[in-house]
From Swiss-Prot:
Residues 380-461 form the KH type-2 domain. This is GTPase Era, mitochondrial. Keywords: GTP-binding, Membrane, Mitochondrion, Mitochondrion inner membrane, Nucleotide-binding, Ribosome biogenesis, RNA-binding, rRNA-binding, Transit peptide. Residues 89-354 form the Era-type G domain. NCBIfam families: small_GTP (TIGR00231). It comes from Gallus gallus (Chicken). The keyword Cell inner membrane does not apply. It is found in: Mitochondrion matrix; Mitochondrion inner membrane. Its main location: mitochondrion. One of its GO terms (molecular function) is rRNA binding. Probable GTPase that plays a role in the mitochondrial ribosomal small subunit assembly. Specifically binds the 12S mitochondrial rRNA (12S mt-rRNA) to a 33 nucleotide section delineating the 3' terminal stem-loop region. May act as a chaperone that protects the 12S mt-rRNA on the 28S mitoribosomal subunit during ribosomal small subunit assembly. One of its GO terms (cellular component) is mitochondrial matrix.
Amino acid sequence: MAAPWLQRWRGAYAGPSGPLRLVRLHGVQRSSWRAAHAAAGAFGAGPHPGPPQRAANPGPGPHPPPVATSREKHARIVQGRPDQPAEPKVLRISIIGAPNSGKSTLSNQLLGRKVFPVSKKVHTTRCKARGVITHEDTQLIILDTPGLTSPMKAKRHKLEAAMLTDPWDSMKHADLVLVLVDVSDHWTRNSLSLEVLKCLSQFPHIPSVLVLNKVDLLKKKIILLGLINELTEGIVNGKKLKVRSEFEYNSSSPAKTVLKVTQTPPPENRARESPCQLETDKAQEGSSLDNSSDVKASESSLDTEAREQKPYKYGDQKNRKGWPHFQDIFMLAALNGEEVDTLKQYLLMQAKPGPWEFHSRVLTSQSPHEICDNIIREKILEYLPLEVPYGVTQVTELWEEGPSGELIIVQNLVVPRKSHKLMLIGRRGALISRIAQEAGQDLMNIFLCDIRLKLKVEVKS
């Protein structure tokens, strides 16, 4: 049962659709679809369209389609005429953020299948690619792009010119932009990067949503209050955020942190006051307070009130940390897919009437050869140290269907030095075998067929 103060708060801000819903990001008893919907922690996401149909893949709808193994067949499907429904809807989504913030991981989770490379090293994504989600009459087109970086960093890492221009090009075609911030990175989480701010200020007319990633890795959830205030400049959906905090500690409370978020009214009611609240129940292990100290619940809240916004001038980014024009905020956990389900539902609701770009059988615009190269390079980036993986050149020698329907792939990995070759092969061939095994498994999950992958290593002559 909710605390008396919370009951009063919810009653005071009850809208036409009833009291505002309480969201628990962790520790929630998911006895209803409303609780599952609430888990993403969206500010102002509006009403949920209904209980999501659970499947093996994240989000609604059937399993995502496989990618054709033949380059020609895949090209025919991608370039073919879309099977338009009677009233099609579409939404083009650009996901931007600093390098290694989790953009490709989020794209894969939304798609329900891993088609984009993911690595702990920066600049894993080298060029823009599109992922396609088709659900009933709605098509979401995800524009997965390289992390926004500066020309100086691009020169230092010897990056292709496309890695500088692709994120900006994707914004030109986007209907909505997701700005991803890794809140577990204490070096970068307190402000949006200069490149992200430049990109947002260049396209201020495109609706933007702030996505805080890996919130489950924060030991102190109260940090989120300060981060939200910094990254939004205290404004969400045109409303000023007021933060009020009272912290008292209870030695008998559970030794875990629970974040609860109250959702704003649906979009059609946003003309009225639309409060959103964060309540943090926090028990601090190893606290300097004596264990016999009095116990009370901790509470924090974010209220909103209308205010006139100052225009955001292009060129002011150096003096700013955040973006005051986000229309919503989502919080995602690193290891939980339910929050991604809710984000996908939100994106489906944002789609507008318009023709589809792709046939419903399309999962990605990447060719099967590009997917293969990216998956193998992901493993190379993961297992080789420092700059070594960036010097590997991939050459596919064989790509054919075997007698039993399996896909046979032979790829040559060319390295600049003999020492790099020894590193890549590993002791008694252990590392190259591991890379081939893991990459082969990922390719099987993408193409939905047996894969025989052979990797060879040679020194560049």
